[in-house]
């Protein structure tokens, strides 16, 4: 069980009178510290890889710019459920083509999802397809998903997720990952862009795909993405005009500094990234493998912590407003976002409540002070993690908890 805390925002770009970082007015150069695990969608489930895939592969459904709602991408309709709720039928557009001239039909759609499950790569998104029993293709433009869950409300989100890119069955392997060189050489793309060149985690080149018939056509002809080792190098690239746009990830301090630079424009919006505080059900206070297991008391401890976290303080003081307080499992900007935690925990308006936490513990018969062990990774989730967890420790201790931080 996790406590949603923060959701990210912000990208930075240089403001220029003309031209671009590449020297070509038609080329946009993007800088990022993200890493790409795999260009093949079956081999990755991370932001860096998805940033490549979402630009070169089509989906049945996607989000248009500036909206959280899903709309048809290469689908021709919104899909329909059977009367018994076990089959979801999608019609796809006719005459679809990959950049290499291969036809894109329902067979490619079925192939794309089936291979994710068959390959079941340890870094891949196969877990997202757990509710899909099987897929049928009665004709070239019809796909039928047989669902294990009746009227599964998450299915369309899954079809638009990292498990959802549609690939060319004439190029991709059915039972193993296909390397980036082969994918590029065979032009196996049907998304807004074509990946024209790629050197792993160094540079990627994209050109507009004129045959794309989906929701979000490219608005420029060429994009170049440069990959940086860390945020300090990315910040320097912005300041020196080496990139037009910096997206994922600059530190809060970097963004704060760049926002004061008249040559740089900082754009803020929903980022889709979340930060959670997660409990281990086994070893948390009163956990299943603790000295005194008790499900009701364990739940009370989790609820008490949820009542004590000051999300606004973390967002402002630690992350300098590059994150926003989050009161949902689903971040702002994605379908299904609702601030349900805002009224469920704390004072009902987004702030913490020590009194409410105390009552929850008392009602469950939990003795105080509660001893908590917080553990975090100092670099994997950003350089501000140490400050974030120090602030969390202080918040919990102020309310009387005893916190060990590692």
Question: Model-predicted segments: where are they?
Answer:
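Periplasmic-binding protein-like
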Residues: 291-336
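N-terminal lobe/hinge region of extracytoplasmic solute-binding protein
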Residues: 31-81, 114, 188-189
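Ligand/substrate-recognition segments at binding pockets and active sites
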Residues: 361-395, 405-406
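Structural transition elements
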Residues: 324-363, 379-385
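Gly/Pro-rich hinge or "lid" segments in bacterial periplasmic/extracellular proteins
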Residues: 160-216
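Ligand-site clamp/hinge motif
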Residues: 210-257
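Aromatic- and charge-enriched surface segment that lines or borders ligand/interaction sites
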Residues: 77-122, 138, 144-146, 294-297
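Surface-exposed binding/hinge segments that line
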Residues: 126-172, 197
């Amino acid at each position: 069980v996790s406590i949603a805390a923060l959701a990210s925002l912000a990208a930075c770009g240089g403001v220029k009178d003309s031209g671009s970082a590449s020297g070509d007015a038609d080329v946009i150069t993007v800088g990022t510290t993200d890493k790409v695990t795999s260009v093949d969608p079956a081999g990755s489930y991370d932001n860096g890889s998805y940033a490549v895939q979402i630009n070169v592969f089509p989906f049945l459904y996607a989000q248009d710019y500036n909206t959280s709602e899903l709309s048809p991408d290469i689908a021709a309709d919104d899909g329909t459920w059977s009367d018994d709720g076990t089959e979801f039928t999608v019609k796809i557009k006719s005459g679809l083509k990959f950049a290499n001239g291969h036809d894109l039909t329902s067979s490619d759609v079925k192939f794309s999802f089936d291979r994710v499950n068959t390959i079941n790569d340890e870094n891949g998104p196969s877990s997202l397809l757990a509710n899909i029993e099987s897929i049928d293709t009665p004709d070239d433009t019809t796909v039928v998903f047989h669902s294990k869950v009746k009227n599964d409300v998450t299915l369309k989100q899954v079809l638009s997720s990292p498990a959802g890119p549609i690939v060319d069955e004439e190029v991709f392997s059915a039972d193993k990952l296909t390397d980036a060189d082969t994918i590029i050489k065979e032009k196996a793309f049907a998304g807004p862009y074509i990946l024209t060149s790629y050197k792993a985690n160094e540079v990627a080149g994209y050109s507009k795909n004129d045959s794309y018939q989906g929701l979000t056509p490219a608005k420029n002809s060429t994009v170049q993405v440069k990959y940086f080792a860390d945020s300090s190098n990315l910040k320097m690239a912005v300041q020196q005009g080496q990139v037009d746009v910096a997206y994922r990830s600059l530190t809060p301090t970097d963004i704060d500094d760049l926002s004061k630079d008249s040559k740089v424009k900082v754009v803020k919006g929903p980022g889709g990234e979340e930060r959670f505080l997660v409990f281990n059900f086994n070893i948390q206070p009163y956990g299943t493998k603790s000295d005194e297991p008790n499900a009701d008391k364990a739940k009370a401890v989790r609820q008490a912590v949820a009542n004590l976290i000051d999300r606004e303080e973390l967002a402002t003081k630690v992350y300098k407003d590059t994150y926003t307080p989050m009161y949902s499992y689903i971040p702002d900007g994605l379908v299904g976002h609702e601030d349900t935690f805002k009224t469920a925990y704390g004072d009902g308006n987004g702030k913490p409540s020590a009194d409410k936490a105390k009552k929850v513990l008392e009602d469950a018969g939990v003795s105080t002070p509660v001893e908590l062990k917080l553990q975090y990774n100092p670099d994997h989730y950003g350089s501000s993690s140490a400050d974030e967890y120090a602030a969390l420790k202080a918040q919990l201790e102020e309310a009387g908890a005893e916190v060990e931080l590692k």
